[in-house]
Protein backbone atom coordinates (compact mmCIF):
# COMPACT_ATOMS: atom_id res chain seq x y z
CA UNK A 1 0.00 0.00 0.00
CA UNK A 2 1.11 3.55 -0.74
CA UNK A 3 0.03 6.15 1.84
CA UNK A 4 -0.27 9.72 0.56
CA UNK A 5 -0.33 12.04 3.58
CA UNK A 6 -2.41 15.17 3.95
CA UNK A 7 -0.19 16.36 6.81
CA UNK A 8 2.91 15.19 8.68
CA UNK A 9 3.83 16.38 12.17
CA UNK A 10 6.58 15.49 14.62
CA UNK A 11 5.66 13.97 17.99
CA UNK A 12 8.80 15.33 19.65
CA UNK A 13 9.70 11.80 20.77
CA UNK A 14 12.78 10.30 19.09
CA UNK A 15 11.96 12.09 15.84
CA UNK A 16 8.83 10.01 15.38
CA UNK A 17 6.18 11.45 13.09
CA UNK A 18 2.44 11.16 12.77
CA UNK A 19 0.90 11.18 9.30
CA UNK A 20 -2.67 12.16 8.58
CA UNK A 21 -3.46 10.26 5.39
CA UNK A 22 -5.44 11.90 2.65
CA UNK A 23 -5.55 8.73 0.56
CA UNK A 24 -4.17 5.20 0.37
CA UNK A 25 -3.36 3.52 -2.95
CA UNK A 26 -3.35 -0.28 -2.88
CA UNK A 27 -1.80 -2.26 -5.75
CA UNK A 28 -2.59 -5.94 -5.26
CA UNK A 29 -2.43 -9.23 -7.10
CA UNK A 30 -6.06 -8.95 -8.23
CA UNK A 31 -6.98 -5.25 -8.22
CA UNK A 32 -5.93 -1.64 -7.80
CA UNK A 33 -7.90 0.39 -5.27
CA UNK A 34 -7.97 3.90 -3.80
CA UNK A 35 -9.21 4.77 -0.31
CA UNK A 36 -9.66 8.42 0.59
CA UNK A 37 -10.31 10.31 3.80
CA UNK A 38 -12.03 13.33 2.28
CA UNK A 39 -14.76 14.40 1.68
CA UNK A 40 -15.67 11.23 3.57
CA UNK A 41 -13.77 8.07 4.39
CA UNK A 42 -14.27 5.06 2.16
CA UNK A 43 -13.13 3.20 -0.93
CA UNK A 44 -13.29 5.53 -3.92
CA UNK A 45 -12.77 3.02 -6.69
CA UNK A 46 -11.46 -0.46 -7.39
CA UNK A 47 -10.29 -1.68 -10.80
CA UNK A 48 -9.69 -5.41 -11.20
CA UNK A 49 -6.49 -6.26 -13.06
CA UNK A 50 -8.48 -8.25 -15.64
CA UNK A 51 -10.16 -4.95 -16.60
CA UNK A 52 -7.08 -2.69 -16.43
CA UNK A 53 -6.00 -1.60 -19.94
CA UNK A 54 -3.85 1.55 -19.77
CA UNK A 55 -1.47 3.18 -17.28
CA UNK A 56 -0.45 6.84 -17.38
CA UNK A 57 2.59 7.74 -15.29
CA UNK A 58 3.48 11.46 -15.05
CA UNK A 59 6.43 12.97 -13.19
CA UNK A 60 7.33 16.69 -13.25
CA UNK A 61 9.95 17.62 -10.66
CA UNK A 62 8.19 16.96 -7.30
CA UNK A 63 4.77 16.39 -8.88
CA UNK A 64 3.65 12.85 -9.66
CA UNK A 65 0.39 11.55 -11.09
CA UNK A 66 -0.69 7.99 -11.75
CA UNK A 67 -3.80 7.03 -13.69
CA UNK A 68 -5.20 3.52 -14.03
CA UNK A 69 -7.72 3.17 -16.86
CA UNK A 70 -10.27 0.60 -17.90
CA UNK A 71 -13.31 0.79 -20.16
CA UNK A 72 -15.59 1.52 -17.21
CA UNK A 73 -13.41 3.22 -14.62
CA UNK A 74 -10.58 5.73 -14.27
CA UNK A 75 -8.57 5.96 -11.04
CA UNK A 76 -6.08 8.83 -10.54
CA UNK A 77 -3.77 9.60 -7.64
CA UNK A 78 -1.36 12.53 -7.15
CA UNK A 79 1.73 12.32 -4.95
CA UNK A 80 5.13 13.86 -4.16
CA UNK A 81 7.89 12.23 -6.23
CA UNK A 82 10.26 12.29 -3.24
CA UNK A 83 8.59 8.93 -2.49
CA UNK A 84 8.89 7.64 -6.07
CA UNK A 85 11.48 5.00 -5.15
CA UNK A 86 8.99 3.44 -2.72
CA UNK A 87 6.32 3.21 -5.41
CA UNK A 88 8.36 1.90 -8.36
CA UNK A 89 8.67 -1.77 -7.26
CA UNK A 90 4.87 -2.07 -6.97
CA UNK A 91 4.38 -0.45 -10.39
CA UNK A 92 6.87 -2.79 -12.05
CA UNK A 93 5.20 -5.77 -10.39
CA UNK A 94 1.82 -4.56 -11.65
CA UNK A 95 3.17 -4.22 -15.20
CA UNK A 96 4.57 -7.76 -14.97
CA UNK A 97 1.12 -9.06 -14.05
CA UNK A 98 -0.48 -7.25 -16.99
CA UNK A 99 2.24 -8.15 -19.50
CA UNK A 100 0.97 -11.43 -20.91
CA UNK A 101 3.08 -13.59 -23.20
CA UNK A 102 6.23 -12.22 -24.81
CA UNK A 103 5.69 -11.07 -28.41
CA UNK A 104 8.05 -10.34 -31.29
CA UNK A 105 9.73 -6.96 -31.71
CA UNK A 106 10.55 -5.73 -35.27
CA UNK A 107 14.16 -4.94 -34.31
CA UNK A 108 16.40 -3.84 -31.45
CA UNK A 109 17.13 -0.17 -32.16
CA UNK A 110 20.27 1.62 -31.03
CA UNK A 111 19.87 4.64 -28.75
CA UNK A 112 23.04 6.32 -30.03
CA UNK A 113 22.35 9.90 -31.12
CA UNK A 114 19.36 10.50 -28.85
CA UNK A 115 19.45 13.52 -26.52
CA UNK A 116 20.89 12.58 -23.12
CA UNK A 117 17.54 12.52 -21.31
CA UNK A 118 15.95 10.26 -23.91
CA UNK A 119 19.01 8.03 -24.23
CA UNK A 120 18.65 7.33 -20.51
CA UNK A 121 14.89 6.84 -20.64
CA UNK A 122 14.92 4.51 -23.65
CA UNK A 123 17.23 2.13 -21.77
CA UNK A 124 15.23 2.22 -18.54
CA UNK A 125 12.71 -0.22 -17.07
CA UNK A 126 10.09 2.53 -17.38
CA UNK A 127 10.33 2.10 -21.16
CA UNK A 128 11.38 -1.54 -21.55
CA UNK A 129 9.90 -3.19 -18.42
CA UNK A 130 13.11 -5.25 -18.36
CA UNK A 131 16.18 -3.11 -19.02
CA UNK A 132 17.82 -5.85 -21.12
CA UNK A 133 14.72 -6.44 -23.28
CA UNK A 134 14.89 -5.68 -27.03
CA UNK A 135 12.90 -2.67 -28.22
CA UNK A 136 11.97 -0.86 -31.41
CA UNK A 137 11.48 2.87 -31.02
CA UNK A 138 11.12 6.17 -32.83
CA UNK A 139 11.98 9.59 -31.42
CA UNK A 140 10.97 13.03 -32.68
CA UNK A 141 11.27 16.60 -31.40
CA UNK A 142 8.51 19.14 -31.94
CA UNK A 143 9.47 22.85 -32.13
CA UNK A 144 8.57 24.82 -28.99
CA UNK A 145 5.59 27.15 -28.83
CA UNK A 146 7.75 30.05 -27.64
CA UNK A 147 11.41 31.03 -27.39
CA UNK A 148 11.37 30.39 -23.66
CA UNK A 149 10.61 26.71 -24.15
CA UNK A 150 12.80 23.81 -25.23
CA UNK A 151 11.70 21.46 -28.04
CA UNK A 152 9.09 18.90 -27.00
CA UNK A 153 10.44 15.34 -27.19
CA UNK A 154 8.24 12.35 -28.14
CA UNK A 155 9.22 8.68 -27.98
CA UNK A 156 7.21 5.66 -29.11
CA UNK A 157 8.66 2.31 -28.04
CA UNK A 158 7.59 -1.28 -28.58
CA UNK A 159 9.01 -3.86 -26.19
CA UNK A 160 8.06 -7.57 -26.08
CA UNK A 161 5.19 -6.88 -23.67
CA UNK A 162 4.00 -3.28 -24.07
CA UNK A 163 3.52 -0.30 -26.33
CA UNK A 164 5.00 2.70 -24.49
CA UNK A 165 4.52 6.35 -25.47
CA UNK A 166 6.62 8.97 -23.67
CA UNK A 167 6.70 12.73 -24.11
CA UNK A 168 7.94 15.84 -22.39
CA UNK A 169 5.15 17.25 -20.21
CA UNK A 170 3.12 19.34 -22.69
CA UNK A 171 1.51 21.83 -20.30
CA UNK A 172 4.65 23.25 -18.71
CA UNK A 173 7.81 25.00 -19.85
CA UNK A 174 9.77 22.67 -17.58
CA UNK A 175 11.30 19.65 -19.33
CA UNK A 176 12.40 17.96 -16.10
CA UNK A 177 9.87 15.17 -16.25
CA UNK A 178 8.06 12.76 -18.53
CA UNK A 179 4.48 11.81 -19.35
CA UNK A 180 4.30 8.06 -20.03
CA UNK A 181 1.45 5.93 -21.41
CA UNK A 182 1.82 2.17 -21.05
CA UNK A 183 -0.48 -0.22 -22.94
CA UNK A 184 0.06 -3.98 -22.50
CA UNK A 185 0.28 -5.66 -25.92
CA UNK A 186 -2.03 -8.40 -24.65
CA UNK A 187 -4.76 -5.73 -24.38
CA UNK A 188 -4.15 -4.01 -27.74
CA UNK A 189 -6.86 -4.39 -30.36
CA UNK A 190 -6.26 -1.61 -32.88
CA UNK A 191 -3.86 1.26 -33.60
CA UNK A 192 -4.73 3.84 -36.25
CA UNK A 193 -3.90 7.40 -37.27
CA UNK A 194 -6.59 9.94 -36.43
CA UNK A 195 -5.88 13.49 -37.68
CA UNK A 196 -2.83 14.62 -35.63
CA UNK A 197 -3.25 11.81 -33.11
CA UNK A 198 -2.83 8.06 -32.89
CA UNK A 199 -5.99 6.26 -31.80
CA UNK A 200 -5.27 3.22 -29.65
CA UNK A 201 -7.98 0.79 -28.66
CA UNK A 202 -7.11 -1.52 -25.81
CA UNK A 203 -10.19 -3.67 -25.47
CA UNK A 204 -12.87 -1.18 -24.38
CA UNK A 205 -10.48 1.69 -23.60
CA UNK A 206 -9.71 4.24 -26.31
CA UNK A 207 -6.77 6.65 -26.06
CA UNK A 208 -6.01 9.50 -28.48
CA UNK A 209 -2.30 10.28 -28.18
CA UNK A 210 -0.84 13.34 -29.97
CA UNK A 211 2.18 12.05 -31.90
CA UNK A 212 4.46 13.62 -34.52
CA UNK A 213 4.20 12.07 -38.04
CA UNK A 214 7.34 9.93 -37.59
CA UNK A 215 5.79 8.20 -34.58
CA UNK A 216 2.38 7.80 -36.21
CA UNK A 217 4.06 6.14 -39.20
CA UNK A 218 5.96 3.76 -36.91
CA UNK A 219 2.76 2.79 -35.09
CA UNK A 220 1.06 2.08 -38.43
CA UNK A 221 3.95 -0.20 -39.48
CA UNK A 222 4.05 -2.08 -36.21
CA UNK A 223 0.28 -2.60 -36.14
CA UNK A 224 -0.93 -2.71 -39.77
Regions found by a protein language model. Give the residues of each.
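Intrinsic disorder/low-complexity detector
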Residues: 1-22, 50, 57-160, 168, ...
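Extracellular/lumenal glycan-associated surfaces
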Residues: 27-34, 159-164
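DNA polymerase sliding clamps and clamp-related checkpoint/processivity subunits
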Residues: 34-48
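Long, acidic/polar, low-complexity amphipathic helices and coiled-coil-like
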Residues: 21-25, 37
